[in-house]
Amino acid sequence: AKARKVDVIRGYGHFLDPNHLEVEETTGTSQDKTGAKKVVKFRHCIIAAGSAAVHLPFIPQDPRIVDSTGALELRQVPAKMLVIGGGIIGLEMATVYSTLGARIDVVEMMDALMQGPDRDAVKVWEKQNAHRFDKIMLKTKTVGVEAREDGLYVKFEGEGAPAEPVKYDM
């Protein structure tokens, strides 16, 4: 950000008017308020709220199970990988690992991938990228994961669900 002359401010903010934002700053990556307030004047404002991974309660703790941050730190490419969630971040990870040689399945409980963007844009993306994945299971939920020595066995429910658990390396 500094190389592009962008100031990053972390905290809780509210707009005072169309060109001013008051921010109550927080410490580091935590949400603890420092008490310091800053008023920022701008012509154009980008709000990058970030995201946090959802940890599903039925998924066991296992080093082969990672969130999107952990997926960026893998030292080797798994042979077969499941991506839970067909949103932008999940599909970004799926595309990266497919390009690196992993066989990828994507499971999404909604009826389409990427719920936020324009549907026509998503269709273009799907047409250009669907070949990268072994399976895209829509209207399907992950309902169980069993971590065994030889792999992760995943159970699904829904329209695109396989009848038996499927084995994944990650």
Question: What does each model-found stretch correspond to?
Answer:
Residues 1-7:
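A structural motif corresponding to the C-terminal end of an alpha-helix
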Residues 44-102, 107, 132, 136:
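Glycine-rich dinucleotide-binding loop and its adjacent helix/turn
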